[in-house]
Amino acid sequence: MHKLTLTAAVMAASVCPGAHAADILPLKQGIYVPANRPCKGASNAEIVNYRGGKSSFGSAQATCTIEKVTRNGNVFTVTDKCADIRTGGEIVGGPTLVTIANPTSFTRAGETYRYCGTKVQF
């Protein structure tokens, strides 16, 4: 039984390089900005946070939790539940298509994002 569990864990790691064991999406945890913008000085409106685990893509205004993910190759359909950080009120949205090129780059809503580390750069 332990051998089977270890084999499954090794296989999962090879399929999703860069992802932590508990991460649902194969992305590095941290800050992402539009690919055509510098990491340093990106505005709050441009910054997307990915914290891993069941956390979905957050922003300066919202925190989101993944409720469901389906995958077709490198295209993920993410259904999440978001709340306004200040009021706690629900932010309504639909499923989001995310194309993950590699552990540090993804495209969402026609915008390609790139990894900028774990902290916002001012």
Named regions from a protein language model:
Residues 38, 79-122:
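Beta-sheet ligand-binding and adhesion/scaffold domains
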Residues 22-63, 85-92:
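Short, solvent-exposed loop/hinge segments that bridge or flank secondary-structure elements
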Residues 10, 15, 32-33, 58, ...:
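Processing junctions and N-termini across compartments
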Residues 28-31, 53-56, 72-79, 103-106:
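Short, hydrophobic/aromatic-rich segments at coil-to-beta transitions
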Residues 1-8:
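Bacterial N-terminal signal peptides that target proteins for export
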Residues 23-27, 67-74, 99-103, 118:
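A short, structured loop/turn motif at beta-sheet edges
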Residues 16-21:
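Sec/Tat signal peptide C-region and signal peptidase I cleavage site
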